[in-house]
Regions:
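Flexible loop/turn segments at secondary-structure boundaries
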Residues: 43, 96-98, 176, 197-200
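Active-site pocket-lining segments that scaffold enzyme catalytic pockets across diverse folds
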Residues: 136-187
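Short, small-residue-enriched loops and turns at beta-alpha junctions
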Residues: 128-130, 160, 197-199
Length: 208
């Protein structure tokens, strides 16, 4: 599966790479906002591509204090040892009750085991509320996404004819939006024809 960053992490940092973390400490520790990234390893980068450097992470996120991810646990431990910490917040979002625990959920459970005296709280509702209010740049981005979607749908209509496969119309839509500058679709394309058109989450796109 393609990696998809936690949407709240992307909202707060502008970064969409794996194995990163963001710590906001409302204590007297030296740094209150710390971004953690993977350390570049040349041998690994030959196989999987370049990793984000500290300078690049600073430039994208606007966060000055950027460190390597292998130091995140020790920093949290030091902060807790030095300060009186009453509560810790984790982004513990689940799509549904039956979902597998996210990485954040696993970290939260480990935190509870290590520090049972500290109240564990869910930061998800607070960040979700922040994301509901859009600034001018975000509104422009949404308007651009609407325009690109419209162009993609118009291409689907222009190429639609009897005998075409659903996945062919999916390809037409996704080709157009990418040619218009979109990196990807927001969710898997639903190209339901006939009775498949009434399925809210149809996704096989294998029929004519």
């Amino acid at each position: 599966f393609d990696f998809e960053a936690n949407h709240h992490f992307f909202y707060l940092t502008g970064l969409r790479r794996e194995n990163m973390a963001l710590v906001l400490a409302n204590t007297h520790c030296p740094a209150h906002v710390i971004l953690f990234i993977e350390e570049p390893i040349p041998d690994m980068e030959r196989w999987t591509g370049r990793r984000v450097t500290i300078d690049e992470a600073r430039a994208v996120s606007g966060i000055d204090d950027v460190r390597y991810i292998d130091s995140v646990d020790s920093l949290i431990s030091r902060c807790i040892a030095r300060e009186t910490v009453e509560a810790a917040y984790f982004d513990c979002y689940r799509n549904a009750m039956g979902d597998v625990d996210s990485y954040n959920m696993h970290k939260a459970k480990r935190f509870m085991q290590a520090y049972p005296a500290i109240a564990l709280k869910d930061a998800h509702p607070m960040i979700a509320a922040m994301r509901m209010v859009k600034d001018e740049d975000e509104v422009k981005t949404l308007e651009r996404a609407i325009t690109v979607t419209d162009q993609g749908l118009r291409r689907v209509l222009a190429t639609l004819e009897p005998g075409r496969m659903e996945y062919q119309q999916q390809a037409e839509f996704e080709y157009e939006i990418r040619m218009q500058g979109a990196e990807r679709v927001s969710f898997p394309t639903i190209a339901g024809s006939g009775m498949n058109g009434c399925m809210l989450h149809y996704g096989t796109n294998q029929c004519k």
